[in-house]
C-alpha cells in the first residue's frame, strides 16, 4: 500500500541550494496539457498503439471486465467522439501502464511491455509508483478547484484576472475563454478589486484583485466551476 499526499506551495529560491529542480507535471504527463489545443502525442503515439493493444487477445485469462478494452480506451482518452474528462488522469495513466506503453511497465517486467518493439517515450518516468501517485494528485486537485477555493492558495495576495486564468489553465490543462472566465469568477463573488493596478509592458494597466474570503461563509462549495471546452 502506498499513500500519497499533495502539498500546494509556491516556488522558493532556496530549493536550488538543495540541488532540487521544479518540473511541470506535464513533463511527466504531456498528453494532459491542452493549453495549446489537442496534444500531438495523442494522435501520433498514444491513440494508434492503444487501439492496437485493445484489439489484441489477452495473453492469459483475465477476470471479466464490465467494459471492454476498446470502450475503456475511448472513454479515458476521448477518442472517436467521446468527451475528454480532465479528471481521469489516473485512469489514463493506469491504462497506459496496463498496455505496457510507459517506462514503468517495462521496468516492472510487465508482459505487455515486452510486446512493443517501437514503444515511444510517453513522458518522463519516475521512481517506484511515484508517477501513479502524481496522477492521483492531479486528478484530485483538478476536481477540487471546482468546489473549493484551493486555486487561491497558489496565488499571491493580489493578482490580475489574467494571472488567475493562467493558473487555472495550468492545472486543468486547456485554454479558457478570457471574457467568459472573468464573468464566471466575478459573478461567483470569488474575488474583489483592491483598487490598485499592475502596469504591463505595451498595454493598459490591469486591475488587481484579491480572494474574497467572505464567500467561504456564504455558500458551501465556492470553487472555480469551469468546464474546459465550454467556457
Regions picked out by a protein language model, each given a short descriptive name:
Residues 1-134, 138-150, 167, 197-202, ...:
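Unchanged
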Residues 152-168:
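Short acidic, hydrophobic short linear motifs in intrinsically disordered regions
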Residues 175-195:
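Charge-enriched amphipathic alpha-helical scaffolds
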Residues 188, 196, 208, 212-214:
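Charge-dense, extended regions
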Residues 5, 164, 171, 179:
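The catalytic Nudix box helix
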Residues 146, 161, 181-183:
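Charged, low-complexity intrinsically disordered regulatory/assembly segments
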Amino acid at each position: 500500500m502506498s499513500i500519497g499526499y499533495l502539498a500546494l506551495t509556491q516556488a522558493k529560491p532556496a530549493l536550488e541550494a538543495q540541488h532540487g529542480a521544479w518540473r511541470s507535471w506535464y513533463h511527466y504527463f504531456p498528453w494532459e496539457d491542452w493549453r495549446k489545443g489537442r496534444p500531438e502525442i495523442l494522435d501520433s503515439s498514444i491513440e494508434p498503439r492503444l487501439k492496437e493493444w485493445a484489439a489484441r487477445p489477452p495473453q492469459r485469462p483475465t477476470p471479466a471486465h464490465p467494459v471492454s478494452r476498446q470502450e475503456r480506451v475511448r472513454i479515458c482518452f476521448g477518442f472517436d467522439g467521446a468527451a475528454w474528462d480532465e479528471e481521469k488522469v489516473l485512469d489514463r495513466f493506469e491504462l497506459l501502464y496496463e498496455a505496457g506503453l510507459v517506462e514503468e511497465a517495462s521496468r516492472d517486467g510487465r508482459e505487455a511491455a515486452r510486446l512493443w518493439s517501437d514503444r515511444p517515450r510517453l513522458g518522463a518516468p519516475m521512481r517506484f509508483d511515484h508517477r501513479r501517485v502524481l496522477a492521483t494528485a492531479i486528478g484530485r486537485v483538478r476536481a477540487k478547484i471546482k468546489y473549493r477555493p484551493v486555486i487561491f492558495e497558489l496565488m499571491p495576495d493580489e493578482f490580475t484576472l489574467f494571472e488567475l486564468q493562467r493558473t487555472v489553465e495550468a492545472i486543468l490543462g486547456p485554454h479558457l475563454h478570457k471574457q467568459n472566465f472573468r464573468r464566471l469568477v466575478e459573478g461567483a463573488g470569488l474575488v474583489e478589486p483592491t483598487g490598485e493596478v499592475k502596469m504591463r509592458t505595451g498595454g493598459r494597466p490591469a486591475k488587481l484583485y484579491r480572494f474574497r474570503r467572505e464567500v467561504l461563509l456564504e455558500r458551501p462549495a465556492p470553487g472555480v466551476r469551469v468546464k474546459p471546452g465550454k467556457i
